[in-house]
Regions:
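Structured alpha/beta or helical-core interaction and ligand-binding surfaces enriched in interleaved
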Residues: 1-195
Length: 195
């Protein structure tokens, strides 16, 4: 039980650079799951249509609770491809949270990013390092890049993008420092609650 601890190890205003550094860290994983988690908040119709093209069949949800005329929670169920812009505009902002086969959508996802917060998460397993008494734990280990944010839990919006390494629930600053050094960086702040 519990959540991983996420350490910020790279920050930039260049989304492609953040993605590239995240991929360099993913290459260090002893194992990487076959699926990646993709999350994006969409604030414009253009952004919504771009993301729908990248993630065909994705489900979109309202950001925040919306109540219909019957007093029940509203659901977004319009076809993004065929609905007129003016109708979609009234439903924004929306978000999507999807899993995709690793390697199938990440680059197109980054290219389609708008100004909303977004994230890609790769779950995996860091290699064991018995000399340092560090052992990977698949439930917690991985890499995450948060676009327009500096919070592993997708908190407040920022201009920059942040790459996190996730380690076990007790934290592992020495491992995070080693991983950061691999990409020419350093741990940029306190550990955060991860996934």
């Amino acid at each position: 039980m519990g959540n991983s601890r996420a350490y910020p190890v790279f920050r930039t205003t260049d989304a492609t650079a953040a993605y590239t550094q995240a991929m360099r860290l993913c290459a260090l994983l002893a194992e990487c799951e076959d699926e990646v988690g993709l999350m994006a908040e969409l604030e414009t119709v253009e952004d919504l249509r771009k993301m729908a093209a990248v993630l065909p069949g994705a489900t979109f949800h309202y950001v925040g609770v919306r109540t219909g005329s019957n007093g029940h929670s509203g659901w977004f169920d319009l076809d993004v491809a065929t609905t007129e812009d003016v109708v979609l505009e009234a439903h924004l902002p929306l978000y999507t949270l999807e899993d995709a086969a690793r390697g199938s959508a990440e680059e197109r996802f980054v290219a389609a990013l708008g100004q909303g917060t977004a994230a890609i998460g790769w779950h995996g397993l860091w290699p064991d390092d018995p000399e340092a008494d560090q052992y990977g734990i698949a439930k917690y280990d991985g890499v995450q890049v948060v676009f327009h944010g500096d919070d592993a839990q997708w908190g407040r919006w920022t201009e920059h993008h942040t790459v996190f390494v996730h380690v076990d629930k007790w934290g592992d600053l020495p491992r995070a420092e080693k991983l950061a050094a691999h990409i020419g960086g350093e741990v940029l702040g306190e550990e955060q609650l991860g996934w």
